Amino acid sequence: YNVSSPIQADDAISVTLASGQLETIKSIIPTAPGLIVYTDKSSWMVTGGSLGSAIGPSAIVAQRQSLVGANDLPPIIRNFDILYGSYLGSSIWDSNYNYYAQIFTGSDVSEISSHLFYDFSFPQWADAFAPFRLIWAVRNDGVLLSFTFAKEEQFMAWSHCITAGNFTSVAVVPEATADSE
């Protein structure tokens, strides 16, 4: 790594997440307050020392936000919400920034339909935002789930699609006026 003495603003950055255990980074999401780092055991906010300040080799602070770890499913960002799969694979979490508490908080959005999630994992999902605000998720047994997520309208619902076949993957193709599944 490129490190000068004394430290320069363009030097490599290294930070230790003081969790007391080994954690594997699953994804890093840039947000207005700072970087959100999802590991297999928790989530962390990394800033330059204060919210919104630049991160540098001499200005870096990591604070744990949640004890719900993430799996390998890439997070989906919807407006100010980050949706991610839990490390154990049987639930989907919604994480967003609470400006009052100055912390990312989360809730289990799969709890409302836990029978669709118990003992299953999700190898793939895709966001079809327009026009119906759907998220398509493929379950490890080949069942396709759809998730309508309109948080600003306080509406979310899960359903499963009954077909004669099994799904192995899902993709969304953006078009001129809507996303195609």
List PLM regions with ranges.
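Short, intrinsically disordered, charge-balanced linker/junction segments flanking boundaries
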Residues: 178-181
